[in-house]
Every structure is written in structure tokens, then in C-alpha cells.
A protein has these predicted regions:
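A cytosolic small-molecule/anion-sensing beta-strand core signal
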Residues: 27, 55-56, 72-73, 91, ...
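Beta-strand residues in well-ordered beta-sheet regions across diverse protein folds
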Residues: 34, 54-55, 62, 88, ...
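Structural motif
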Residues: 30, 39, 58-60, 84, ...
């Protein structure tokens, strides 16, 4: 049976920053919703790319050795595997992350 997911309902339940919550699975991929508030430490993922989609708010992704990436609502970016990055937000922002199920959102 097809799944209907109310993303905004999940947003209203989010309280803790930097604690991604799985909201859907598609094959071997997972969609996680996260509240970004402040800055997450620099990290990387050795085995997989990571996609950030800004649902609400704005984030900046610091990328080691490259210009910062600024994402506003409706924008997304793919961070390739092995690229050190650090997402941050000045105000609470809600992000959808599309990634392999086995990926540790906190990095290697």
C-alpha cells in the first residue's frame, strides 16, 4: 500500500537540533528530517554522497577547501563522498536529507 507522509506534521514534532529522524525509506535510501540550529562539526562520509534539501529556513554548508554553499528554502545540494563539510544555520531550519540507509548522519 502506498505511504502518505505529512512532512509538516513531522516538522511540528521536531524539538532537538542535530537529531535526524527517519521519515521514509525508498529502496536502499532513507529520507531523514533534521532540525539544524547552530553549527555541526566538520565531518565526511567515506562511502556515500549526501543530499541536503532546505524545507524551511536557510543553511550554510562549509566545505573544506571550497567556497561555502548557501541554501535557502526549496534549494538543495549534493555533498560528494569523502568531502569534509560542516552545515550550520543562524536560525532553526528544517532539512530533508536523502542518503543511503547505512549512512551514519554524524559522519565517519
Amino acid at each position: 500500500m502506498p505511504s502518505i507522509i505529512d512532512v509538516w506534521d513531522h516538522v511540528q514534532q521536531m524539538r532537538q537540533p542535530w537529531a535526524p529522524k527517519e521519515i521514509a525509506r525508498v529502496n536502499d535510501q532513507v529520507i531523514r528530517l533534521a532540525l539544524f540550529d547552530g553549527e555541526f562539526p566538520m565531518h565526511k562520509h567515506s562511502n556515500a554522497d549526501e543530499l541536503f534539501y532546505v524545507l524551511k529556513g536557510q543553511i550554510t554548508i562549509r566545505v573544506k577547501g571550497q567556497p561555502d554553499i548557501v541554501l535557502t528554502e526549496g534549494k538543495m545540494a549534493v555533498i560528494p563522498r569523502n568531502v569534509e563539510h560542516s552545515p550550520k544555520s543562524v536560525k532553526p531550519s528544517y532539512i530533508l536529507m536523502f542518503e543511503p540507509l547505512a549512512l551514519n548522519p554524524r559522519g565517519d
